[in-house]
Amino acid sequence: APASGFFGMR
């Protein structure tokens, strides 16, 4: 779930 990581960074 790479998308989760992107959202977490933001």
UniProtKB/Swiss-Prot annotation:
Biological processes annotated in GO: neuropeptide signaling pathway
Major localisation: secreted
Cytoplasm is among the record's keywords: no
Recorded superkingdom: Eukaryota
Post-translational modification: Tachykinin-related peptide 3(3-10) occurs in two forms, Rhopr-TRP-3(3-10) has unmodified Met-9 and Ox-Rhopr-TRP-3(3-10) has oxidation at Met-9.
Presence of the UniProt keyword Phosphoprotein in the record: no
Protein name per Swiss-Prot or TrEMBL: Tachykinin-related peptide 3
Modified residues (Methionine sulfoxide): M9
Localization, UniProt: Secreted
GO cellular component: extracellular region
Positions bearing Arginine amide: R10
Record's function text: Myoactive peptide. Increases the amplitude and frequency of spontaneous contractions and tonus of hindgut muscle.
UniProt keyword terms in alphabetical order: Amidation, Neuropeptide, Oxidation, Secreted
